[in-house]
């Protein structure tokens, strides 16, 4: 994922458009159906895992410590995650109420977590583990009914043909020469492997184009290939721009759609399916020293706020080098899953509600039901703007209690019952007249 860049570089990224052919993209019917499924799913598990986990300092450790590529390669023989259990990971996602998983097939270090035939810089050929974790996860997701997306970094700190260098990767010791077109051929080769050898994928989550914003990334060629290989697979890119033709969803890193607290997300919110990608602590890859864990209430609030903005939440864990997911992450996921088992009706299958986000919370909607998510409000009376249709009834989702309300031409005023102790989100269900 992306770390803050110097201001001058960030401005250059924002002001320069990549040279990409603007082709006419008509999504297939299967793709449109997959988009609707994606919007219904609402919650996914993001996994950042690779040889960098050995250094216990996040996924950017190669860049942050200025590690040369030749030195970094010595990590691979030490990477032997014998405690990795694909069934356990997928079951954990299920228990959390997640409907899909997105895992790093290749991060910025260039190391493939699958058995690539176009490179030997991968988990099967360079590590004593010698197993294809992407294949194992793909098979287990099919068994347990989740969809698998693959994260793929366009940026590469290891490949010699990733040249000219971009904003990062200058201390890796690679020769100051290379053929970027040849690198893109290599990238397309690996993507073809993923899209032809691992069954039906949910889609691909690109990252790293921001490293060389002025480059011609041959998006049309790559996107056409992917859509031809798997028409239903969704293509998205974390480039922090307005979506390009061929992209099927728009993501926001460490922010809700329309916000830019992290400094990355300057693009307007599109009409494509949306996704917020966020961490449980402050790191994407495993970081032993990062103990700044979000509480269950914070994660639930993030999920609810995303849903109220018509977006999914892709919540990240960074597994340990052993293949285990640390206890703090597992605990948090189980807590969120318990909340969703009680309140999932107001999340799954919904879209952003008729009321724009407010300081007190958000609304979601499913057919004739509007779910009022009261996250932060002390007054027993809550005034809502006028709704598209008359309100027939108002009840508390948790226990079915009736909620008194008054409706006028100007709006609806709810009289909220006392909140239960520790209640993160008081959800009032409004039944609208048909």
Which role fits each region the language model picked out?
Residues 1-4, 93:
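Positively charged n-region of N-terminal signal peptides that target proteins for export
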Residues 6-16:
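Bacterial N-terminal signal peptides
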Residues 17-21:
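Sec/Tat signal peptide C-region and signal peptidase I cleavage site
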Residues 22-434:
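Mature catalytic domains of secreted/periplasmic carbohydrate-active enzymes
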């Amino acid at each position: 994922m992306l770390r803050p860049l110097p201001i001058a570089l960030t401005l250059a990224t924002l002001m320069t458009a990549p040279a990409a052919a603007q082709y006419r993209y008509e999504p297939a019917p299967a793709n449109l159906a997959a988009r609707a499924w994606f919007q219904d799913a609402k919650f996914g598990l993001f996994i950042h895992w690779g040889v960098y986990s050995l250094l216990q300092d996040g996924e950017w450790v190669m860049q942050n410590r200025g590690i040369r590529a030749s030195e970094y390669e010595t990590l691979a023989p030490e990477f032997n995650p014998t405690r990795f259990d694909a069934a356990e990971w997928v079951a954990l996602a299920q228990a959390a109420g997640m409907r899909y998983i997105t895992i790093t097939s290749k991060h910025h270090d260039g190391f493939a977590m699958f058995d690539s035939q176009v490179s030997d810089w991968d988990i099967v050929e360079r590590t004593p583990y010698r197993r294809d974790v992407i294949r194992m996860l793909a098979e287990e997701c099919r068994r347990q009914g989740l969809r698998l997306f693959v994260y793929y970094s366009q940026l590469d700190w290891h490949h010699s043909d990733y040249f000219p260098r971009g904003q990062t990767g200058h201390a890796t010791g690679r020769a100051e020469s290379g053929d970027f077109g040849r690198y893109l051929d290599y990238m397309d080769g690996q993507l073809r492997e993923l899209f032809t050898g691992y069954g039906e994928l949910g889609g691909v989550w690109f990252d790293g184009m921001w490293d060389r914003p002025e480059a011609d990334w041959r998006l049309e060629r790559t996107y056409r290939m992917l859509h031809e290989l798997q028409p239903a697979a969704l293509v998205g890119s974390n480039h922090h721009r307005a979506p390009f033709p061929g992209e099927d969803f728009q993501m926001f890193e460490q922010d809700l759609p329309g916000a830019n607290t992290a400094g990355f997300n300057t693009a307007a919110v599109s009409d494509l399916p949306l996704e917020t990608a966020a961490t449980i602590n402050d790191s994407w890859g495993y970081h032993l020293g990062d103990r700044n864990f979000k509480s269950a209430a914070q994660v639930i609030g993030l999920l609810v706020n995303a849903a109220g903005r018509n977006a999914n939440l892709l919540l990240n864990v960074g597994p340990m080098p052993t293949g285990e997911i640390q206890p703090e992450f597992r605990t948090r996921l189980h807590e969120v899953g318990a909340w969703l088992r009680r309140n999932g009706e107001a999340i799954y299958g919904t879209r952003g509600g008729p009321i724009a986000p407010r300081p007190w919370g958000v609304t979601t909607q499913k057919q004739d039901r509007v779910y009022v998510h009261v996250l932060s409000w002390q007054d027993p009376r809550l005034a809502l703007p006028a709704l598209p249709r008359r309100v027939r009834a108002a009840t508390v989702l948790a226990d079915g209690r009736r909620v008194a309300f008054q409706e006028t031409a100007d709006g609806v005023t709810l009289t909220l019952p006392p909140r239960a102790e520790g209640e993160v989100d008081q959800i009032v269900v409004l039944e609208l007249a048909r």
